[in-house]
Amino acid sequence: MVRASYLQIYNENISDLLKTERSSLQIREDKKRGVFVEGLSEWAVRTPHEIYSLMQRGAMVRATAATKMNDVSSRSHAVFIMIVEQMTMQDQSQTDPSKQIKVGKLNLVDLAGSERVRVTGATGKRLEECKKIN
């Protein structure tokens, strides 16, 4: 089974790029799940095309803006997460075989553009974004 999620960190707020509502999500940690983003949607995917479609969908709503250096500059950090699970059966000869689940997680990270304010001439909203990017 493969699941995918896509989030952005913009102005110190985490949001789900695959949901229509833009609520601020929280990072949590527990013994079973480790570090996770509470409320982040997970989408079951079966093909590379489905993965690419989710990436495109999230990229369309990601925070971007024009600067003097780039026509389209990402203003948020983004993380595309893929979780792969594999279930195997242990010793099939037993009447009650135990199951083993292997989990792999891949985080694809795209960091926000951090152009120098002096070079880009950022003011107003762009200047406030620059302060929070790093």
What are the functions of these language-model segments?
Residues M1-N134:
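P-loop NTPase "switch/coupling" elements that transmit nucleotide state to mechanical/effector output
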